[in-house]
């Protein structure tokens, strides 16, 4: 376990395309909060640094950037482009103590991969020093990175079911029925 055996502080990065869209806020915040929970269960102190929205909305961080065992470094580019996400990811991946990074949607994940094209630090073997990268979405660039081991894996949604629920909701609304939120599943995939 890279975190358990670390000689000093380690960094886990997260790149979000923005801090305003609710789906990205929830996805990014969910990653941060679950990571804090898991790290603290292993006895680690955690700080969240970077983008103000994500820092202020993180739940349970118990360390400062100066003294935490793990810093979750959250970056949001000035605009939503792969190139600017790549710049943010490069800044995180260039840290000697970066052990993992998450791109929270297709744009951010492709930005992480573009950053890696220059740095060549991502891989699936943390024990040998690879930075573990994961993404969100199933575009061809991300799927290829999962298949070749650059990304350990990624999470995707079910567009078919999202379309189905959209038609269901439209029909219900047209018939005057009250609508409720419909949760949709996410699915992890890797090279296996």
Predicted regions and their residues:
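A residue-level marker of the well-folded mature domains of exported/periplasmic proteins
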Residues: 1-192
